[in-house]
UniProtKB/Swiss-Prot annotation:
The gene is pyrF. Pathway: Pyrimidine metabolism; UMP biosynthesis via de novo pathway; UMP from orotate: step 2/2. The lineage of its organism: Bacteria, Bacillati, Bacillota, Bacilli, Bacillales. This is Orotidine 5'-phosphate decarboxylase. Homodimer. One of its GO terms (biological process) is 'de novo' pyrimidine nucleobase biosynthetic process. It comes from Shouchella clausii (strain KSM-K16) (Alkalihalobacillus clausii).
Length: 239
């Protein structure tokens, strides 16, 4: 799976999503199905997009007791998506159960979906970490520790800010994957994400994959913006 560029399909209507994807008929896309879309359209949207040939990141961020997460992952494995995720804050036992469930649910002859863990949401800042979550460690320290726990649990990688990628790569294996949301163009508004970078900056920092949402989905010309950002992603050199 080569350096994916996932587009987050965060649409509130089926027709809007259809029109959006129709404008990309000439492109081979990687797409992300988040909670909003999955809870609205259910399994049908996964089957529809998989049959259409898209590579899928099913972004449900599971966080529950180990038994529940393990059984859920076993069911999700049958969907044959490419990437799934959990919250690292659920702990090692939960992450290990998630991996066991995926392994058990993956059909013979099929490749197990990559399993990654969310470290901290890109909407989280240091103030929230300290005042609301009562975590008295620096953001970088928390993210790296969660990444190490994910690796120790056998996961394939983590979701993190691109700014944190170099720290994670220094602390974890070279094969450990980093998927970075919070991707914008320089001209875009930041919105509710506080730790953001451009595609080229993410590549230079070592991100394996990026996730882009509103910069493309809310653009007047989504295809043109996608091509611009994808070129920035592909053309950048990893430092």
């Amino acid at each position: 799976m080569n350096r994916p560029f996932f587009i987050a399909l965060d649409f509130d209507e089926h027709a809007k999503r259809q029109r959006f994807l129709e404008s990309f008929a000439a492109e081979t896309l990687d797409v992300k199905i988040g909670m909003e879309l999955f809870y609205r359209e259910g399994l049908s949207v996964v089957h529809e997009l998989k049959e259409a040939g898209y590579r899928l990141f099913l972004d449900l961020k599971l966080h529950d007791i180990p038994n529940t997460v393990g059984r859920t992952m076993r069911a999700l494995a049958e969907l044959d998506v490419d990437v799934v995720n959990v919250h690292a804050a659920g702990g090692k036992a939960m992450m290990e159960a998630a991996l066991e469930g995926l392994d058990a649910g993956t059909r013979a002859g099929k490749q197990r979906p990559k399993l990654i863990a969310v470290t901290q949401l890109t909407s989280t800042d240091s103030r929230m970490l300290a005042e609301e979550l009562l975590i008295d460690k620096a953001m970088d320290e928390v993210v790296v520790r969660y990444a190490q726990l994910a690796q120790e649990s056998g996961l394939d990688g983590v979701v993190c800010s691109a700014h944190e990628v170099p720290l994670i790569r220094a602390a974890c294996s070279d094969r450990f994957l980093t998927v970075t949301p919070g991707i914008r163009r320089q001209v875009d508004q930041v919105g509710d994400q506080v730790r953001v970078v451009t595609p080229g900056e993410a590549k230079a920092l070592g991100s394996w994959a990026i996730v882009v949402g509103r910069s493309i989905t809310a653009a007047a010309d989504p295809l043109a913006v996608y091509r611009e950002m994808n070129q920035d992603w592909k053309g950048a050199t990893e430092h």
